[in-house]
Design a protein with these regions (language model features):
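Extracellular low-complexity, Gly/Ser/Thr-rich intrinsically disordered linkers
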Residues: 1-82
Length: 82
């Protein structure tokens, strides 16, 4: 977990507590689909704030539950990109 993005993927995939935020693991398949959709939405030269917003948009596009979307938000808060 050498970087913000790597830590975020780890938290979403496996779950853990970081910076006082507890994130539930969603598994590799769900996170892979989430990031695939996120990348499809990305503008040229995105930043971490964009990543936060796009992850939430992608989660909604994929029909994730409100609990799953809240989990994505919590993971973003944990790595401080919210």
């Amino acid at each position: 977990n050498s970087g913000v993005g790597n830590k975020l993927v780890y938290l979403l995939t496996d779950g853990d507590t970081f910076n006082g935020k507890t994130v539930s693991g969603m598994g590799q398949a769900a996170v892979r689909n989430l990031y695939w959709e996120t990348v499809a939405l990305m503008p040229v030269s995105p930043n971490y704030h964009d990543l936060h917003d796009l992850l939430l948009d992608a989660a909604g596009n994929l029909g994730m539950t409100s609990t799953q979307i809240a989990n994505v938000q919590t993971a973003c808060e944990a790595v401080e990109i919210d």
